[in-house]
């Protein structure tokens, strides 16, 4: 993985410290052209990996990249699925079963499962999960996507429900069908790491909040440091600036000295902030091994 990954929170009005700034960003990035302008700034600064949700707007970005292979020859996507609001809206509009029908192909598969009762439905959970993953991955067809994440909303929901077998299904399918590395976003890295290991998933790629002041690091600051020092996890650090509470130089320097942190993901909407973070990561972390 590259040392520095570019995230997409800023494009969809997500800011953990300022609702006003979040609203302004949501307005600014209503057009795909505005998103592409910022992505071009990042790409030209040497940040070639875009860690993004499977929002419908990202499909438009993928189309732009696919249509210009000479311009975006090194552009890499790290899809993060599923986009939670898309499914929540479908459940609201169509109900739970209707939502599943909405996203699955219309080939009678779901009707067969439902007609077969609980036993058949239980056996077919794997098949439904794989079909939903494939639907999410469609927008990245023909594009470089070597790492695929489960979004934290779903990761932590599955973790809380104790349905950790879903992680095994995801892991196997991403490796077998897409030749990619499965990865996980969570708000509680120590708990998730233990759960993944119980499913036989070792040294997973986990993206979580990691910063000097413990901002939004559920599970305990010391537990994160213990996991990183153990060598059991390949970490992607997010919220390294703690939404602006830590000076940039101090934040990156601290992260660079942690074992087990392979990458940092950050979001920015100005060329100055993009280039500033890139310079700090180059200074303290260097090029990927």
Regions found by a protein language model. Name each.
Residues 1-26, 90-121:
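N-terminal small/glycine-rich loop or linker at the start of catalytic domains
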Residues 1-3, 62-71, 131-143, 193-197:
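Short amphipathic alpha-helices and their capping/turn segments at secondary-structure boundaries
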Residues 1-72, 254, 258:
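N-terminal binding-site loop/beta-alpha segment at the start of enzyme catalytic domains
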Residues 17-33, 113-132, 160, 241-246:
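Active-site mouth loops of central-metabolism enzymes
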Residues 27-38, 55-64, 126-137, 162-172, ...:
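Well-ordered, non-membrane alpha-helical segments in soluble/globular domains
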Residues 75-88:
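A short, structured active-site edge motif that brings together acidic residues
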Residues 85, 137, 141-146, 153-289:
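Beta/alpha (TIM)-barrel catalytic core signal, keyed to glycine-rich beta->alpha loops juxtaposed to Asp/Glu
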Residues 98-155:
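Active-site gating/metal-coordination segments in enzymes
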